């Protein structure tokens, strides 16, 4: 039964329905996986989708970077030169681009590890999701500071990009839960090798 559909502030193309199932029964032939194995099945699905969240983050940051770079190259804000000529703006843009490339590389590595099923695939995928999603929120906010109050205007894409980025740490397994249940469990395991994900 559909309980409600969340009317999200961002990521508008993604439907967020809440369902409640009561008294649902099925035959053993229709069970996906094994009885009692649902948690593992769901976690395996998240392994494949976690790098995609990192890639979402890259796309959002890249769009925000392009908007901020264009603004910095064309706006003088009452000065004699475009604001990109000021060190503070250059540093902010350089830091943003560094973060974008770091998330891009981690997400690619994670996706490749999932694709070829390396032993470190789960850890890399989870790091891509957590690091990518949280970095996107921070970087888009930093790029909004480059633009200033104009970034809050509907004519600029930055506000919408931030609204989309804000959901990334929350969906597909919230980052706090990913840290607590998955990454923490990996690191607590007796055979955990912290260098395995390094390749």
Residues covered by each model-derived region:
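FAD-binding core of flavoproteins
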Residues: 1-58, 62, 190-199
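Oxyanion-binding "anion nests"
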Residues: 54-85, 93-97
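C-terminal helix-coil-helix/basic helical segment that borders enzyme active sites and/or dimer interfaces
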Residues: 72-77, 97-131, 142-152
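Alpha-helical transition-metal enzyme core signature, strongest for iron centers
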Residues: 58, 62-65, 93-103, 107, ...
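Alpha-helical scaffold segments that form or flank carboxylate-/histidine-based iron centers
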Residues: 47-50, 84-95, 121-131, 164-167
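Short alpha-helical scaffolding segments that buttress acidic/His motifs in well-ordered protein cores
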Residues: 42, 110, 162-166
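Glycine-rich phosphate/cofactor-binding loops in nucleotide/flavin-utilizing enzymes
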Residues: 147-199
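Conserved catalytic-core motifs characterized by acidic clusters
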Residues: 5-8, 29-46, 70-86, 149, ...
């Amino acid at each position: 039964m559909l309980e409600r559909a969340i009317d999200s502030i961002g990521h508008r193309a993604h439907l967020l329905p809440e369902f409640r199932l009561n008294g649902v029964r099925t035959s053993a032939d229709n069970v996906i996986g094994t009885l009692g194995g649902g948690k593992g099945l769901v976690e395996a699905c998240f392994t494949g989708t976690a790098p995609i969240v990192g890639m979402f983050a890259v796309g959002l940051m890249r769009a925000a970077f392009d908007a901020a770079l264009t603004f910095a190259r064309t706006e003088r804000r009452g000065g004699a030169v475009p604001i990109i000529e000021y060190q503070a703006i250059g540093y902010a843009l350089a830091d943003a681009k560094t973060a974008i490339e770091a998330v891009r590389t981690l997400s690619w590595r994670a996706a490749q590890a999932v694709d070829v099923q390396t032993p470190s695939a789960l850890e890399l995928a989870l790091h891509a999701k957590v690091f990518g999603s949280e970095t996107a929120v921070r970087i888009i906010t930093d790029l909004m500071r480059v633009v200033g109050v104009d970034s809050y205007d509907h004519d600029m894409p930055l506000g919408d990009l931030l609204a989309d980025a804000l959901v990334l740490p929350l969906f597909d397994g919230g980052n706090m839960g990913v840290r607590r249940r998955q990454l923490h469990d990996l690191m607590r395991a007796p055979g955990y090798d912290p260098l395995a994900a390094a390749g």
